Design a protein with these regions (language model features):
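Short, amphipathic alpha-helical interaction segments embedded in low-complexity terminal/linker regions
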Residues: 1-228, 242-244, 354-358
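Acidic, serine/proline-rich low-complexity intrinsically disordered regions
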Residues: 143-358
Length: 358
């Protein structure tokens, strides 16, 4: 047994060396630096930060490089590193209407206080390969408009709330749970649901959000507002007793305006779904908002008609680190289990053969 263990250990070490060599690739090609990943593969970095649960572009870039571009593996690496970090303080609640806007659009109102800002997007490209990028030419810098954007842009939902078109959502003062410290239970609070959706796999949430548009829990959404920009993060240390600004982060927020409800007390009003992610992960924020609203079906006495409305199904299968780990464990030796099933199958075949002989 000792020889087998040592032999396996050497094989694993060699496999890791081969993987590192494969990651490096052709030595005649310049090695990809973490700064290049962080600056030029920003959307991949944003996804890894969001689902990994750490806002650190450099660490996310390192994880992507170490994982050879496998984003799920990179998310796993970042999650593992996160568990080693001390918890120094809790930040104060972010006021996203104070965001320094980079992009802001609405599909429900053309004219907004503060205006709409198209910002950087692939939305209107023709999805044709740009072969000039193969020439390694320098991309010209985009022109900048000197016109200053408003420092504070009110949310579309805040305007709808003032008009009585949407219900006001207020903080009840309760301490939000922390899913990284407490195992989630079902039914979950909305705070716990949103935390799990943020860390959930983008592809999984995108598919669920798409399913709600195809009749599996239809809730008729409109993109009320999508905004991307920089926001200051503050903490209030007990020893100081006042707020201090510790930096700023890039966020994308999405609020979906959903079909109105008449089931609750008061006048009919629109409902909302909410998504908030690190960086410019706009598609993830939209999918998160769609699924968030779908999971509110019990709150509005709506019939559960699709998988996106099944809270336990959605939340217990959204985490790609957990899912990848369970699927990947099938690669580990299952010799004893298989031998047991093989012996059972042989006995069953023998019984069938005996019956046929009779």
């Amino acid at each position: 047994m000792y020889v087998a263990v040592k032999g396996g250990e050497k094989a694993i070490a060699s496999a890791h060396e081969l993987q590192a060599d494969l990651r490096r690739g052709d030595r005649d090609v310049a090695e990809l630096g973490c700064d290049q990943v962080a600056q030029q593969l920003g959307l991949a970095v944003d996804r890894v930060m969001t689902e990994g649960g750490i806002y650190d572009p450099q660490l996310a870039a390192l994880a992507i490089k170490q994982a050879s571009g496998d984003l799920v593996e990179a998310i796993f690496l970042l999650r593992a590193y996160r568990t080693t970090l001390p918890r120094l303080a809790d930040s104060l609640a972010l006021e996203t209407d104070e965001m320094r806007i980079e992009r802001r659009i609405s599909a429900v109102y053309k004219d907004l206080p503060g205006g709409q800002v198209l910002g950087p997007t692939y939305d209107y490209s023709h999805r044709l390969l740009d072969f000039t990028l193969l020439a390694n030419g320098e991309t010209p810098a985009a022109p900048r408009d000197d016109q200053a954007l408003p420092e504070r842009c009110p949310h579309v939902f805040s305007m709808m709330t003032k008009e009585g078109l949407a219900a006001r959502e207020e903080d009840d003062g309760s301490e939000p749970c922390d899913i990284t410290r407490e195992p989630p239970g079902y039914p979950a609070t909305r705070a716990a649901r949103l935390q799990q959706l943020v860390r959930g796999d983008e592809g999984f949430l995108l598919a669920l959000g798409y399913s709600t548009q195809r009749g599996y829990g239809r809730n008729h959404p409109f993109a009320g507002e999508i905004r991307t920009g920089y926001l200051s993060v503050s903490i209030c240390p007990e020893e100081l007793g006042f707020e201090i600004d510790i930096g700023e982060i890039l966020l994308t927020e999405c609020e979906m305006v959903n079909g109105f409800t008449t089931q609750t007390e008061g006048a009919p009003h629109f409902t909302r779904g909410y998504g908030l992610v690190f960086g410019r992960s706009e598609r993830k924020a939209m999918a998160m908002a769609l699924v968030d609203r779908a999971l509110q079906a019990p709150d509005y006495d709506e019939r559960i008609a699709g998988p996106a409305q099944d809270e336990e199904f959605v939340l217990s299968h959204a985490d790609n680190v957990e899912a990848a780990g369970f699927v990947s464990h099938l690669k580990l030796p299952h010799y004893v289990d298989f031998q047991a099933e093989l012996e059972l199958l042989k006995r069953l075949r023998e019984q069938v053969q005996e019956q046929n002989d009779e």
